Amino acid sequence: DNPLVTPKTIQKLAKTHLKDAVALTMAVVKVSNFNDWRRSFYSFGRIIRDSKGKILKSIEVKDATLEQRKIREVNPSIYCFNASWLWKNLEKLKNTNIQGEFYLTDLLELVINQKKSIETIRINTKEAIGVNTEDQLADAESLLTPTL
């Protein structure tokens, strides 16, 4: 889904996760807008934080309110979980959302409800671009092609 993520970013995610010994470390992206090649980020989940910057949840855009859809910090779904925590909690996922799907992002809510820590790393916007359609593939290719 995120073909432009670099090995350096994955290493940073893993290193941060191991250093901080948290249940979850995740990448986040702050987009300046949802125009041009950044339009695909509009479909990404929004990061909801409290006044102190602590993550409260990541809400899928399909389930977000109009106000929440204005949030420009998005979730590219790049995670590093504590393995033992993950295996103990996967079966707790529910599909009680508009789509009737199981959302991996619901694990964030479980981490929060269990008062476990979440660490985030901000990554380069271009690395986080998702490719699920022909248009998104063209956008990703345009980011790789140097302009003359």
Residue ranges and their predicted role:
Residues 1-51, 80, 88-89:
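Conserved beta-loop-beta/alpha segment of the NTase-like Rossmann-fold superfamily
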Residues 16, 20, 114, 147:
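Phosphate/oxyanion-binding loops and surfaces in catalytic or ligand/nucleic-acid-binding neighborhoods
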